[in-house]
Amino acid sequence: MEALRESIKRPAPTARIRRIPASGNTALAASALIQAALGIEFLLSGLNKFADPNFIRNFTLFVDGSPGTQTGILAPLIHSLVLPNIAFFATLTKYIEVGLGIVLLLGAVEVGRRRFSGALGREHGYEAPVALVAALAGLAAAGLSLTIALLMGEQLPTIQPGRALTTAIPVELLLVPLGIAVAWMEAGRFRVLRRVR
C-alpha cells in the first residue's frame, strides 16, 4: 500500500512533445503559399489602382457598366450609397486592397517562418494578434471578391462552351473560398496561439 501511495505522489516524467505533426506542418506550409498568392493578388491589384491616373473615372465606368448595378441584390445599395460617393469608394478600394495584400503577405511569412526549427522558428508573443488580423483579412478578401463578382453579374460555374479557352471558374469567385480558407486557418492558429500564451 505504501508503494502505491509513493507512485501516486511522484510526478510523471515529462516528455518532449513535438509542436505539430509533420502532416500539419506540411498543411500549414501549403496554406501559407495560398495565403501569399492571395496577398500578392490584392497587393498588386491595389497598386495597379494607385498607378492608374484615371482610376476614379475608370472605377465609375466599371460600376456604371456592371450588370450588378442594374439588377441583382447589390443594385439598391450601389445606387443609394456607392454611386453618390463614387470617388470615396474608389479611393477606399485602393487602400483596402493594398492593406489586405500587405496583411495577408505578412501573415503568410509568419506561418512560413514557424515551419522552421531553431531560432528562426521560435515562438513570439505577437503571433496570436498577427493570426487574428490575418484571419480578418482573409474574410475581408473573400467579402470583397464576392462583392465584385456580384457586381460583375458572375454566375456559379457551369459547363459553358464559351469558356472553353478561359477559366471555368471566374477569378473573383475563385478568390472567395481561398479567402475563407485563409481566414479559417488563421483563426485556428489564433485560437491555438492564444491558449499557449
For each predicted feature, which ranges?
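Extended, low-polarity transmembrane helix blocks
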Residues: 2-197
